[in-house]
UniProtKB/Swiss-Prot annotation:
Gene that encodes the chain: UGT82A1
Entry protein name: UDP-glycosyltransferase 82A1
EC number: 2.4.1.-
Taxonomic source organism: Arabidopsis thaliana (Mouse-ear cress)
Family: Belongs to the UDP-glycosyltransferase family.
Binding site for UDP-alpha-D-glucose: 292, 349-351, 366-374, 388-391
Domain of life: Eukaryota
Length: 461
């Protein structure tokens, strides 16, 4: 009797922590729906995630990225771009052309758009994957209109920084919120070109899968009047490609699928902080983490924030890379961890476990999408300091639309204390968090996500 093989789906994440994590959750969701997932990452990432997840039924394959040190995760945006455009494509093409490989689809992180053309050439259906808030994609999608109206130049430079960006079903954004405005002017122009190329490549996609939920902008002013118009226009997309399928938040899928990704972190998590958290009063601890992808807030700001946290007298847990810990004020670590027992500083924290701990009262965050949704799932208030990319759009929703957080204006004692007071003492914020959690992760949201998974499964079988 011939055994029928499960159809394979190949997943190509962008090689960064905040992109690999949701892609692994997506792969596990398809595994539970009868597919055989194959996740392809650079060697350095492959080593970190494959060993601890090898028994799940997900196949992990390594891609050469041409790095001199294959054991070190890639960190520079433009060196990663060079690897993706010039080194990785032939490797994926060889895999797709293997005669005995039954590939139903290739799922490509839109930041790894190089893989779209490879799959197209091999005649394999392609789905794009947007691992962050869909509002950020809509801002990228608006690039041609931003250029046409003169808000930005042909090279992506804002003509007027104070100018407001107005889009249907979006909060008002400023030109400073544009996600390619990172680094030097030269780097910003190169990032803008990167996004233009990405947009051009998405035209051949059949679907775009998102790690967001369909009602993310329900609280935007005048939403109800424009939502139907937008849906009629989109439907999702009125029969035109690519079709938008909201599947998120994806970390919420594990409870439904009964499949748990053992480890998604590239770094060793310091579990010792959990015991310290258990000793603290409920809703008292400030948790601080500015993410994994970019250098955080800068050495001078780290020093200022450290002294402000100490002056606050509040207990805190700070996830801070060991390299950046070297820039902390002299004697700070000993004072707060030993003398006062006020806080703990770890190089990397088990974030989900931390946020679920009853002692945590608020989360000082860079507003990364994964972190934001984990905080919402745990009903944690947010004190926001966006650093790069889509984080500025996320922050706008957190503070102005959903009203589940406060934007931190600076790192001095007064700014930090004012921010903490506002976020901790808002009597209505807890209720707004509960409502958002229900909307994003409740029964209706899960049903909507499941319908989209079922639709896609039927399309691929």
């Amino acid at each position: 009797m011939k055994v029928t093989q499960k159809p394979k789906i190949i997943f190509i994440p962008y090689p960064a922590q905040g992109h690999v994590t949701p892609m692994l959750h997506l792969a596990s969701a398809f595994l539970s729906r009868g597919f055989s997932p194959v996740v392809m990452t650079p060697e350095s990432i492959h080593r970190r995630i494959s060993a601890t997840n090898e028994d799940l039924g997900i196949t992990f394959l390594a891609l050469s990225d041409g790095q001199d040190r294959p054991d070190a995760p890639p960190s520079d945006f433009f060196s990663i771009e060079n690897s993706m455009e010039n080194i990785m494509p032939p490797q994926l093409e060889r895999l797709l052309l293997e005669e005995d490989l039954d590939v139903a689809c290739v799922v490509v992180d839109l930041l790894a758009s190089w893989a779209i053309g490879v799959a197209d050439r091999c005649g394999v259906p392609v789905a794009g994957f947007w691992p962050v808030m869909f509002a950020a994609y809509r801002l990228i999608q608006a690039i041609p209109e931003l250029v046409r109206t003169g808000l930005v130049s042909q090279k992506g430079c804002p003509r007027q920084l104070e100018k407001t960006i107005v889009q249907p079903e979006q909060p008002l954004l400023s030109a400073e919120d544009l996600p390619w405005l990172i680094g030097t002017p030269k780097a910003q122009k190169k990032r803008f070109k990167f996004w233009q190329r990405t947009l051009e490549r998405t035209k051949s996609l059949r679907w775009i899968l998102t790690s967001s939920f369909k009602d993310e902008y329900e609280d935007v002013d005048n939403h109800k009047a424009s939502y139907k118009k937008s849906n009629d226009l989109n439907k999702e997309n009125n029969g035109q490609n690519p079709q938008i399928l909201h599947l998120g938040p994806l970390h919420n899928q594990e409870a439904t699928n009964n499949i748990t990704i053992t480890k998604t972190s590239f770094w060793e998590e310091d579990m010792s902080c959990l015991g310290w958290l258990q000793e603290q009063n409920p809703n008292s601890v400030i948790y601080i983490s500015f993410g994994s992808w970019v250098s955080p807030i800068g050495e001078s700001n780290i020093q200022t924030l450290a002294l402000a946290l100490e002056a606050s007298g509040r207990p805190f847990l700070w996830a801070l890379n060991r390299v950046w810990q070297e820039g902390l004020p002299p004697g700070f670590v000993h004072r707060v961890t030993i003398t006062k027992n006020q806080g703990r500083i770890v190089s990397w924290a088990p974030q989900l476990e931390v946020l679920r701990n009853d002692s945590v009262g608020c989360y000082v965050t860079h507003c990364g999408w994964n972190s934001t949704m984990e905080a919402v799932a745990s009903s944690r208030r947010l004190l926001c300091y966006p650093v790069a990319g889509d984080q500025f759009v996320n922050c706008k929703y957190i503070v102005d639309v959903w009203k589940i957080g406060v934007r931190l204006s600076g790192f001095g004692e007064k700014e930090v204390e004012d921010g903490l007071r506002k976020v901790m003492e808002d009597q209505d914020m807890g209720e707004r968090l509960r409502k958002l959690r229900d909307r994003a992760m409740g029964n209706e949201a899960r049903l909507s996500s499941e319908m989209n998974f079922t639709f896609l499964k039927n399309e691929l079988n």
